[in-house]
Amino acid sequence: MTAATIQRNKPSGFRISKKVLPYVLSLPALLVCIGILIPFFTSVVYSFQRYRLSQPWARQFNWGDNYISFFTDPRFWNTLEISLLYAGITVLLELLLGLGIAILLQKRSTLNNFISIMLLMPLMTAPALAALMWKLMTNPGFGVLSYLASLIGLQDFRWASSPSTALFTVVLVDIWVYTPFIMILLLAGLRSLPTQPFEAAALDGVPRSFVFFRITLPMLTPYILTATLFRLLDSIQQFDIIYAMTQGGPGDTLTVFQVEAYLNFFQSTNVGRSAALMIILWAITYFLSNIFIKNWLRLRERARGLA
C-alpha cells in the first residue's frame, strides 16, 4: 500500500508553474492579435504614402493627401453611397425573411429541424462559388432563370449585365446565401425565450399580434441586433459575390469599398489609395459596431426585465 501511494504521489516529469500557466494559455490569443495588428498598422502606414507598385522607387510620404483627395472625388462618394445602399437593402430583406422563417420553424419537431438543416445549405456554399453558380443560371443564352423569366414575358432580361438590374441580381444572390445565417440565430433566440409570459398571455386570451409586438419582439431584440450587426459588418465589406458576378460593373454600378480597393491595388497599382480606402472602411465598421453594441447592452437589460 505504501509503495503504491508513493508511486501515485510521484511528480510528473513535466509541470508548468501556476504563475506561468496563464501566459501560456493566452499565447494563442496573443498570436492572433499580432496577426491582426501587423497588417492593420502596415495599412495605416501605406495610407499616408504615395506608393505605386509600378514605381516602388518613388515611394514617399504624402501624409493626408490620399484621404483629402477622397473629399473632392465623385467616385469615392459613389462608392460610399453604393456600399451603404447595398448593405442596407441586403440586411433589411435578410432580416425580414430570416425572422419570418424562424417564426414558422419555431415549434420543435422533426420536420422543422430537418427543414432548418436543409435551409442552411446555401450558407455552407462559398460566396464566390454561389455567385458563379447564379451567374450561370442567369446567363441569357442557357441560364435556367433566364428561361423562366422568358416564360413570364421578360425576354432578354439582362440580370447582372444591366445597370438597372445589376444591384437587384447581386442582392438576390446575397439573400440566398446569408438569410439562413439570420434565420438560425433568430430561431435559436425564439426557442430560448422563457415560456411564462406566453403562457400567461394565452390564459388571458391576448391576441397573437399583441403577443408578437409587445412580448416576443422586445425579448428577441438583442438577438435581432446581434444578427443585424454581424450581417451589416459583413455586407458593407462584401467582395466575393459582387466581383465574381459583375467585377464592380456595369460601369461603376457596384463599385463597393472592397471592389474599389481591389481595383486601385491590382489595376491602378495605387497601394496608398487602396490602403486609405480600407482604413476608411474600418472606421465606418468601428463606428457602426459601437452603436449596435451600446444598443444591444441596453436592450438586453430591458429584455431581462420582461422575462
Question: At which residue positions do the language-model features occur?
Answer:
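Short, Lys/Arg-rich, polar N-terminal cytosolic tail immediately upstream
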Residues: 1-17
